[in-house]
Regions:
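N-terminal intrinsically disordered/low-complexity leader segments
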Residues: 1-6, 143-145, 190
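Helix-turn-helix
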Residues: 4, 10, 14, 18-52, ...
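Short amphipathic alpha-helix in the helical subdomain of ABC transporter nucleotide-binding domains
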Residues: 4, 126, 147-155, 172-177
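Short helix-capping/turn signature of helix-turn-helix
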Residues: 47, 103-112, 164
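Short, basic, alpha-helical segments at the C-terminal edge of helix-turn-helix-like DNA-binding modules
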Residues: 59-66
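Helical hydrophobic small-molecule/effector-binding pocket
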Residues: 79-105, 167-171, 189
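Amphipathic alpha-helical packing segments from all-alpha helical-bundle domains
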Residues: 94-95, 111-140, 149-152, 156
């Protein structure tokens, strides 16, 4: 047994690997401790319960999937952002099979409100980023938004389409890109 205390990030990395390999059922204090080569007590130094561990693992997976790229090109305009988001959704489904479809069900079954909160925090971060892109996109027509149709409301529509695509595991953004072009831009050009 490894006597060196592991870090929170190493614990979350081991949790992500367990999720990738065996799904949510594999994440518990004992299995993560074994994967890290540390005692169960070492995990409890960072997480006081399985719920706390799973909640942090959810946040960690969302961060891994939607971590902003270094160069920022994906956030130059709305079309680039949508393309990047759909690429990341596909990456997430490949890296973490069943994550999008099953993790909220896990929280409901086990009463894990902390995990649901982490999921909603991640969603809010995605919505905020999308809204920022909409507000700063130089290609958007001046009259595209008004009091009834705000960047925040359109970000919500785009996010709903994204969640629908996740459920269907359809990572082709072409229809959403066309909606953006027709709704926000002059003509149909990029």
């Amino acid at each position: 047994m490894n006597t060196i205390v592991t870090s929170r990030e190493e614990i979350l990395k081991a949790s992500r690997i367990l999720i990738q390999q065996n799904g949510w059922a594999a994440v518990n204090i004992r299995s993560v401790a074994a994967a890290c080569g540390v005692s169960v007590g070492s995990i409890y130094n960072y997480f006081d319960s399985k719920t706390a561990l799973v909640s942090a693992a959810v946040e960690s997976v969302w961060n891994d999937i939607f971590h902003h790229p270094e160069n920022g090109d994906a956030f130059q305009d709305t079309l680039s952002c949508i393309r990047w988001m759909y690429q990341q959704m596909e990456y997430g489904c490949k890296q973490y099979p069943g994550f999008f479809a099953h993790h909220s069900l896990v929280f409901i079954q086990h009463g894990m409100t902390g995990g649901k909160e982490k999921m909603h925090e991640a969603w809010q971060h995605i919505l905020s980023s999308l809204c920022d892109v909409l507000k700063n996109d130089s290609h958007v027509r001046e009259d595209a938004f008004n009091q009834q149709f705000t960047p925040e409301k359109f970000a919500g529509v785009l996010f709903s389409l994204m969640l629908s695509a996740l459920v269907r595991q359809d990572f082709d953004p072409s229809a959403v890109l066309e909606v953006v072009r027709r709704t926000l831009y002059e003509g149909n050009s990029e």
